[in-house]
């Protein structure tokens, strides 16, 4: 499997924006090896997600994860802004690049 580039990931997510927004997502950002240009053939895609108030449910979280994995063809590590580690959260926020921004 060839590594995904940041451009490819953002292009795929861009095409999925209507479906992603329909799940109540207000912000979707990519971080980690893909953003740094260090992803390998077996790398996952690290994604930070923020839902609209009252829209975050377990079912929507899983649906988003499944959608991204199916379309990216890779495992996706999906993390919500609320679940960020106090130790690594600031690093992730600094590195994250928005693919979908709040409207």
Predicted regions and their residues:
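Short hydrophobic/aromatic beta-strand micro-patches
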Residues: 48-50
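Conserved histidines in hydrophobic membrane contexts and catalytic metal-binding motifs
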Residues: 30
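Catalytic core of pol beta-like nucleotidyltransferases
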Residues: 1-27, 35-41, 52-103
């Amino acid at each position: 499997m060839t590594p995904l580039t940041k451009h490819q990931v953002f292009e795929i997510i861009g095409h999925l924006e209507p479906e992603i927004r329909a799940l109540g997502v207000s912000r979707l950002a990519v971080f980690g090896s893909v953003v740094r240009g260090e992803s390998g053939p077996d790398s996952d895609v690290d994604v930070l997600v923020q839902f609209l108030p009252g829209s975050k449910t377990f079912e929507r979280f899983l649906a988003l994860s499944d959608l991204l994995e199916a379309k990216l063809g890779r495992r996706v590590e999906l993390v919500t802004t609320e679940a960020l580690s106090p130790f690594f959260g600031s690093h992730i926020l600094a590195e994250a690049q928005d693919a979908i921004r709040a409207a």
